[in-house]
């Protein structure tokens, strides 16, 4: 009898949510700092507003309940998605209401995209450039037009409808965030059910997501793009639903549609090769990947992810258990291996976030390289300003995510790391030999720095002395990147053996022919030489220094020889109290702060290298006689081998457009260039300054106000050391990024 009762208990469905756990109270939310007892009392000094901003999203400081923290993060994700949908809706609405999309669609190789027209109020209509086809406006470089063309959007109505769909989804997400915190909040065990989460994300989001996108590409994008490529007027092309509902319409373009699903069920999948292809290379009409290749790709990865989504053990006792995998994962030199990591990852969101940010950041940088090497959207490869913008955008995103990974890794070490859980496992062993790790990494940084800059300084000296025959260059002492060249040739030759039916190489960056659209170069083989070898080692240097700072911040987050009780001081602290000299700037937060500057150095060199290399060796025109002429005539190989060359032939020569922009349609970038320099310089006031100086100044100003009986009730206080550094770093990065933005776009739009 007891056995039957037990079985019945097991069969009853688990209740995975709590009903109405937190009341919806606008009265409570109306109190600034309601999440903290001390902040809710209101401000006594100006420090209050800084603490309010520092702690408002630090859910760990609001409560110690892991369940409540998990719910807040989950709810915040819905809020984030809501904002993303509003933003996307705005992009589509601007495309529908204010853009020249349909004009651009008629001639994408000559007409420039715009989604904003400036109204003439104080003469700023000068910003409306002539974009071709009788349209005027501010040129945009987001790539949305190319994405819409690839999606099969042919008119403004479709953009309006999509914008409305985005608003509806934004509302749904906002409601979801409220509902899953206030009405039906998941229990902690739901958040910790990693196998179900993996199955859901792999099979649902990635698998079915890819499948639905493949379906859209096959039924909508392919036929519409085929007709557009053939020069059919967009106004006469049938609407998407007609292609979906009318099989005859599709079979005129792709004959295999007449056969329906029979080839699928009879395993004669080759019948579908008219719309699921494996061509390789680029479409010569659009300069982008073949749409049929892209559809095939999404169909293939959807199958892989749907299979992957059935790998983990949930209800039926079959499949993998993550805990079992981690606990069993032990090598001969790794002690107790990965034991303890499952417990860490199911109780620390910071640990999860650290891993995911590192992977996502790296992926973003990989995406940046794919966007130019394998351009996915029609005509995007000949829109040079857009290509430069997208590369820069994705590398910046990657850099910030990787620094964020270090920040949350350190927070995990301080707040969530339980030493007894990690005895002799891989993480414990990593921490125990951190001195060897950091000192060796430091040696690598010194080696890379001295040798890579040494090569440049040698070249500058030789050129200054007129001894060009003694320089490291392609025409004197060669330092050819032989491994990179070998990989290029390997990738050029491989498809003939590994994919015999492919028509071309994966990417023309490796080798092959020049692909030009409307006489503009979309992609061509990228020749690598001594200049690339040298700047590559600068990349290696800056990446390793960034890694040194960030890794040291994580590995020494809990303690060090200097401060054995660092974990008790928390994530951010200015110094280890008075009377302990030399203990400032040692908190994990300070490592993130320093890491941000090196990340900025690192990404700047990357985007400068990309911009100059593409203008010198890839971007340009092809004449009727098949003569290739590049934007800056191939000066990279001889100029990028000296520091003076970088300053004179890249920064100074290419800044001429932004400096001389006044009185033209790009004059806003000239103003932005100056304003961003100002913001950058303003940051130095915070970074080079002592707190005591400002406190002293404030007190004399307060004295003057008191004399005049106008002293404020909230006492002014100088920024703390940490706050000052945060403000300084923020303005330094904002100023630097906006300066680069103005410099790049004014240059790219002028040559584009």
From Swiss-Prot:
InterPro entries noted in UniProt: PSI_PsaA, PSI_PsaA/B, PSI_PsaA/B_CS, PSI_PsaA/B_sf
Taxonomic superkingdom: Eukaryota
UniProt-listed Enzyme Commission number(s): 1.97.1.12
Alphabetic keyword roster: 4Fe-4S, Chlorophyll, Chloroplast, Chromophore, Electron transport, Iron, Iron-sulfur, Magnesium, Membrane, Metal-binding, Oxidoreductase, Photosynthesis, Photosystem I, Plastid, Thylakoid, Transmembrane, Transmembrane helix, Transport
Entry's cofactor comment: P700 is a chlorophyll a/chlorophyll a' dimer, A0 is one or more chlorophyll a, A1 is one or both phylloquinones and FX is a shared 4Fe-4S iron-sulfur center.
A UniProt-annotated Pfam family: PsaA_PsaB
Amino acids binding phylloquinone: 694
Binding site for chlorophyll a': 677
Residues noted as binding [4Fe-4S] cluster in the record, renumbered to the chain: 575, 584
GO terms for cellular component: chloroplast thylakoid membrane; photosystem I
Binding site for chlorophyll a: 685, 693
GO terms for biological process, alphabetical: photosynthesis
Chief place where the protein resides: plastid
Claim: NAD is one of the keywords in the record: no
Entry keyword Chloroplast: yes
Topology of this chain in the membrane: Multi-pass membrane protein
Subunit note: The PsaA/B heterodimer binds the P700 chlorophyll special pair and subsequent electron acceptors. PSI consists of a core antenna complex that captures photons, and an electron transfer chain that converts photonic excitation into a charge separation. The eukaryotic PSI reaction center is composed of at least 11 subunits.
Stated family: Belongs to the PsaA/PsaB family.
Protein name: Photosystem I P700 chlorophyll a apoprotein A1
Lineage of source species: Eukaryota, Rhodophyta, Bangiophyceae, Cyanidiales, Cyanidiaceae
Underlying gene: psaA
């Amino acid at each position: 009898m007891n056995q039957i009762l037990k079985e019945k208990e097991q069969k009853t469905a688990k209740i995975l949510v709590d009903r109405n756990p937190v009341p919806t109270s606008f009265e409570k939310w109306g109190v600034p700092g309601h999440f903290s007892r001390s902040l809710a009392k209101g401000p006594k000094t100006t420090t209050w507003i800084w603490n309010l901003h520092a702690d408002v999203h630090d859910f760990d400081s609001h409560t110690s309940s892991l369940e409540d923290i998990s719910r807040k993060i989950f709810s915040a994700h819905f809020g984030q998605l809501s904002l993303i949908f509003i933003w996307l809706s705005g992009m589509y609405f601007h495309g529908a209401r204010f853009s020249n999309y349909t004009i651009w669609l008629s001639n994408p190789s000559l007409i420039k995209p715009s989604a904003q027209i400036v109204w003439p109020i104080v003469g700023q209509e000068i910003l409306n450039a002539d974009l071709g086809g009788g349209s005027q406006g501010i040129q945009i470089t987001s790539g949305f037009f190319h994405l819409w063309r690839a999606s099969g959007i042919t008119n403004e109505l479709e953009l309006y409808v999509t914008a409305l769909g985005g608003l509806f989804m934004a509302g749904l997400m906002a409601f979801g965030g409220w509902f899953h915190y206030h009405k039906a909040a998941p229990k902690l065990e739901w958040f910790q059910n990693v196998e179900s989460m993996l199955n859901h994300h792999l099979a649902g989001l990635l698998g079915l997501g890819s499948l639905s996108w493949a379906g859209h590409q096959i039924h909508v994008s392919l036929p519409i793009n085929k007709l557009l490529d053939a020069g059919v007027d967009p106004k006469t092309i049938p609407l998407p639903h007609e292609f979906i509902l009318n099989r005859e319409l599709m079979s005129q373009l792709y004959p295999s549609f007449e056969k329906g699903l029979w080839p699928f069920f009879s395993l004669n999948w080759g019948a579908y090769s008219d719309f699921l292809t494996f061509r390789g290379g680029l479409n010569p009409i659009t300069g982008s990947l073949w749409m049929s290749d892209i559809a095939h790709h999404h169909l293939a990865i959807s199958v892989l992810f749907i299979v992957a989504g059935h790998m983990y053990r949930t209800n039926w006792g079959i499949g993998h258990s993550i805990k079992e995998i981690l606990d069993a994962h032990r090598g001969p030199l790794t002690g107790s291996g990965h034991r303890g990591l499952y417990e860490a990852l199911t109780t620390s969101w910071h640990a999860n976030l650290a891993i995911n940010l590192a992977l996502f950041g790296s992926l973003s940088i990989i995406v940046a390289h794919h966007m130019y090497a394998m351009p996915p959207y029609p005509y995007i490869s000949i829109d040079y300003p857009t290509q430069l913008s997208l590369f820069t955008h994705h590398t910046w995103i990657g850099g910030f995510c990787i620094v964020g990974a270090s920040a949350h890794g350190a927070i995990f070490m301080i707040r969530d790391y339980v030493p007894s859980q990690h005895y002799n496992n891989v993480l414990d062993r990593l921490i125990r030999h951190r001195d060897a790790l950091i000192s060796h990494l430091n040696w690598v940084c010194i080696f890379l720095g001295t040798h890579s800059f040494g090569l440049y300084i040698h070249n500058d000296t030789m050129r200054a002395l007129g001894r060009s025959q003694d320089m490291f260059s392609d025409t004197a002492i060669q330092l050819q990147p032989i491994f990179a060249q070998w990989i290029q040739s390997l990738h050029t030759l491989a498809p003939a053996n590994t994919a015999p039916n492919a028509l071309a190489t994966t990417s023309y960056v490796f080798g092959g022919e020049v692909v030009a659209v409307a006489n503009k170069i979309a992609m061509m083989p990228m020749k690598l030489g001594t200049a690339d070898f040298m700047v590559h080692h600068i990349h290696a240097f800056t990446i390793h220094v960034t890694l040194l700072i960030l890794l040291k911040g994580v590995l020494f987050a809990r303690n060090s020889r200097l401060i054995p009780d660092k974990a008790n001081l928390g994530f951010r602290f200015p110094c280890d109290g008075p009377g302990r000299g030399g203990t400032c700037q040692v908190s994990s937060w300070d490592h993130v702060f320093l890491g941000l500057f090196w990340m900025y150095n690192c990404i700047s060199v990357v985007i400068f290298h990309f911009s100059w290399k593409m203008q010198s060796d890839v971007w340009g025109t092809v004449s009727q006689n098949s003569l290739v002429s590049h934007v800056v005539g191939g000066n990279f190989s001889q100029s990028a081998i000296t520091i003076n060359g970088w300053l004179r032939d890249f920064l100074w020569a290419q800044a001429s457009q932004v400096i001389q922009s006044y009185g033209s349609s790009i004059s806003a970038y000239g103003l932005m260039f100056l304003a961003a320099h100002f913001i950058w310089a303003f940051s130095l006031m915070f970074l080079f300054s002592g707190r005591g100086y400002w406190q002293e100044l404030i007190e004399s100003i307060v004295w003057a106000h008191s004399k005049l009986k106008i002293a404020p009730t909230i006492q002014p206080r100088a920024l703390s050391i940490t706050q000052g550094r945060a403000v300084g770093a923020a303005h330094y990065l904002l100023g630097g990024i906006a300066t680069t933005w103005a410099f790049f776009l004014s240059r790219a739009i002028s040559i584009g």
